[in-house]
Amino acid sequence: MSRKGPFSIRNAAADTFAMVIFCFITGMFIEIFISGMTFEQSLASRMLSIPVNIAIAWPYGVFRDFMLRQGSRVSSMSFIKNVADLTAYVLFQSPVYAAILFTVGASTDQIITAVSSNAAVSCVMGVFYGYFLDACRKAFKVPGYTQRV
């Protein structure tokens, strides 16, 4: 994936929409069904994550595009693109996620479980998020956005 040309509001809007929706749904699932958080804790975490995700969505998109470019220098295989997507997702999201959980009062054990579970699930989730983000960028008609690989 690459975004060619200057910053566009469509790009930021697509990245923000994708991150808020995807992280709300997947985060709640992990927190309740894997980490053992209560519905109320998870809902508080997800509500706090919305403004955080709005703030980090576009920078994450830029970071992801950078990681994809680095991966494409190694190989143009879709496997390498998926590895780059996964790496970008885990490296960028894990510290942010831990901070959100700490802020809403999750225990240290819950934070460790949630962040490590999220990293493990990201082996699939990060790649799906990449596809979801690509679809959102296309739906938002991001100028100059092209699909490579």
Swiss-Prot record:
Listed name of the protein: L-alanine exporter AlaE
GO terms, biological process: amino acid export across plasma membrane
UniProt keyword annotations, A-Z: Amino-acid transport, Cell inner membrane, Cell membrane, Membrane, Transmembrane, Transmembrane helix, Transport
Gene Ontology MF annotations: L-amino acid efflux transmembrane transporter activity
Major subcellular site: membrane
Function: Exports L-alanine.
Segments traversing the membrane: 17-37, 43-63, 86-106, 111-131
Native species: Aliivibrio salmonicida (strain LFI1238)
Compartments, record wording: Cell inner membrane
